[in-house]
């Protein structure tokens, strides 16, 4: 069955129409190939053996890239202890951190989410566990579901040496345990800044729950979060204001 290359098709259109195209493609998928493009089942994985030292005050930030930021943001907005989850861009330079440019796939940016969290309520290691098991498929190289390109790569941008050590150890742990059917391709990249995405991308899953793309690819992830992390799940999402 021929698969739609959403990223290539939408790159030819202005931002507003790209979103419309994503909806039209989603509708087509619902009618002709919904099963092929539905969000993959989440994988139940062990928590990290190595985690950050327990912190009792303040907040911390973490940046994750795992395909289209709509779904990744939507998942983390439902995790207890998360104070904010912002869609944006990481990996490239400030002057190319715009959706239209990033969609061309040559900026070095990945669609990313910056998660602000209270480490006394949820650890960085737990966020990694959610990221790998629910938010995306870490075995897909430069793609997630119907979206293709380096801007959809699986990546972690540690903001400290401790975050980097925890992420490296967890990837090694999961690969050693053969937690997935294929090796993890997630890259640990240098953090050089995070650039928030345009306003119309923020809270997209919550504000557009009937968009076919969201219905097929992203809402199932929130359901899987609730199922696998019932003790961590928050019914009310923490929205960007």
Segments from the language model and where they lie:
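Flexible coil/turn and secondary-structure edge motifs
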Residues: 2-9, 13-16, 22-25, 31, ...
């Amino acid at each position: 069955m021929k698969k739609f290359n959403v990223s290539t098709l939408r790159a030819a259109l202005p931002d507003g129409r790209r979103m419309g195209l994503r909806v039209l493609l989603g509708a087509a998928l619902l009618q002709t190939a919904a099963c092929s493009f539905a969000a993959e089942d989440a994988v139940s994985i062990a928590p990290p053996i190595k985690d950050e030292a327990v912190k009792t005050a303040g907040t911390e930030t973490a940046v994750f890239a795992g395909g289209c930021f709509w779904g990744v943001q939507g998942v983390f907005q439902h995790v207890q202890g998360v104070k904010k989850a912002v869609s944006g861009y990481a990996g490239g330079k400030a002057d190319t951190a715009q959706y239209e440019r990033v969609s061309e796939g040559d900026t070095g940016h990945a669609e990313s989410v910056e998660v602000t969290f209270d480490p006394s309520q949820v650890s960085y290691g737990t966020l990694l566990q959610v990221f790998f098991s629910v938010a995306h498929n870490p075995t897909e190289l430069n793609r997630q579901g119907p979206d293709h390109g380096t801007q959809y790569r699986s990546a972690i941008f540690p903001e400290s040496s401790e975050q980097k050590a925890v992420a490296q150890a967890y990837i090694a742990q999961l690969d050693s345990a053969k937690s997935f059917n294929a090796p993890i391709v997630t890259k640990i990249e240098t953090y050089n800044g995070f650039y928030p995405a345009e306003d119309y991308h923020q809270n997209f899953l919550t504000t557009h729950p009937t968009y076919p793309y969201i219905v097929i690819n992203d809402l199932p992830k929130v359901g899987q979060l609730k199922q696998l992390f019932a003790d961590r799940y928050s019914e009310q999402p923490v929205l960007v204001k």
